[in-house]
Regions:
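Conserved small-residue packing positions in alpha-helical repeats and bundles
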Residues: 1, 12, 29, 57, ...
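Alpha-helical linker/edge segments of TPR/alpha-solenoid repeat scaffolds
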Residues: 2-5, 31-55, 95-134, 189-220, ...
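TPR-repeat structural position
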Residues: 4-5, 66-67, 161-162
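Alpha-helical solenoid repeat scaffolds, predominantly canonical TPR units
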Residues: 9-13, 53, 60, 65, ...
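Boundary/linker segments of alpha-helical solenoid repeat arrays
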Residues: 17-30, 80-89, 174-188, 197-200, ...
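Short coil turns that delineate tetratricopeptide repeat
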Residues: 18-19, 47, 64, 74, ...
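TPR repeat positional signature
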Residues: 25, 46, 50-53, 149, ...
Length: 253
C-alpha cells in the first residue's frame, strides 16, 4: 500500500540517527517534493518525549515566545523525571560481569556486594548521560537538567512572573551557586518583587531531593574508586569539589 506520510516519517527517523547517510537524505528530498506529504509528517518516530519537549521549548525561547517556551520546558521536566525513574529502575538487576567470565569471577561476599552495589549506582548516575543523548550526536547535552532552569528563569521573567523567575533562578543556583550572571538575575528579580517576598521563595523541592540523592551516590562511588579502585566517571560538571576524595582530586590535577 502506498503510504508516503509513513515513509517520510520512517526516513526522517533513520536520518536523525544517521545524519551522514546520503541515500536517505536523497529519499527525504524526494518525499519533500511529493504531493500530499506535509512538513509535520517528517517526525522522529523514536524521539524521546523529554527531548522533544525540550527542543520545542528552546525553539520558542529563541523565537521570543516565552509563554510557549514555558509550557514545553515545564513539560520537558515532567517527562525527564518519568524517563529518569524508568532508567534508574533498569539498573536494578543482577550483576553484569562485563569482561569477566562469570566462572572465573572470584570474590568473597563483601567484595561481591560492593561490586554489585557500585555497579548499580554507577548505572544510575549514567542515566544523566543517557537522558541527555540525542540520536546522531556523539556527545550528550552538557548540564541538561540544570539548563532547563536557565531557560525557564528568563522565560518567566519575560512573561512577567517574577515569583517563578526567582524560583527557577534559585533552583539553577543549586547546581552552580557561583554563577555570576544568574546571581545578578536573581538580585534583579528580588529587587523588583521585594526582598520580603523573594526570601520566602525556595528552589523546587523535587530538584533539591534529586541533587541530594545524586550527591550521596557520587560520594559512595568516589569512595569506592578511592578505596577499592572501582572506576567512576562523573557525568556532571556541577559536582562540588569537596565530594571528591582529596587523593582523587590530586590525581586529576
Amino acid at each position: 500500500m502506498n503510504r508516503p506520510a509513513q515513509a517520510a516519517a520512517a526516513a526522517h527517523t533513520f536520518f536523525v540517527a544517521n545524519p551522514g547517510h546520503q541515500e536517505m537524505r536523497q529519499n527525504l528530498e524526494y518525499y519533500q517534493a511529493m504531493v500530499g506529504v506535509r512538513e509535520d509528517d517528517f517526525t522522529d518516530l523514536e524521539a524521546k518525549p523529554h527531548l522533544s519537549e525540550f527542543r520545542l521549548g528552546v525553539r520558542f525561547y529563541t523565537e521570543e515566545q516565552p509563554a510557549a517556551a514555558i509550557l514545553h520546558l515545564e513539560k520537558a521536566l515532567e517527562e525527564y523525571f518519568v524517563a529518569d525513574a524508568e532508567c534508574r529502575a533498569l539498573c536494578e538487576g543482577p550483576y553484569d560481569y562485563e569482561g569477566y567470565n562469570y566462572l572465573e569471577y572470584n570474590a568473597d561476599l563483601f567484595q561481591a556486594i560492593t561490586d554489585h552495589s557500585m555497579q548499580v549506582l554507577s548505572c544510575k548516575q549514567g542515566c544523566v548521560t543517557e537522558l541527555a543523548s540525542q540520536p546522531g550526536r556523539e556527545k550528550a547535552l552538557e548540564d541538561f537538567l540544570p539548563s532547563h532552569f536557565n531557560y525557564l528563569q528568563f522565560a518567566y521573567y519575560k512573561n512577567g512572573n517574577y515569583e517563578k523567575a526567582i524560583e527557577c533562578a534559585k533552583t539553577y543556583l543549586l547546581f552552580f551557586p557561583h554563577d555570576e550572571v544568574m546571581n545578578q538575575n536573581l538580585a534583579y528579580y528580588t529587587a523588583v518583587l521585594g526582598e520580603n517576598l523573594a526570601r520566602l521563595i525556595q528552589p523546587r523541592e523535587e530538584i533539591q531531593v534529586y541533587r541530594q540523592r545524586s550527591l550521596m551516590e557520587k560520594e559512595l562511588l568516589f569512595f569506592s574508586y578511592d578505596i577499592f579502585s572501582i572506576p567512576f566517571v562523573d557525568p556532571d560538571t556541577w559536582t562540588p569539589e569537596e565530594v571528591i576524595p582529596k587523593r582523587l582530586r590530586e590525581k586529576q590535577k
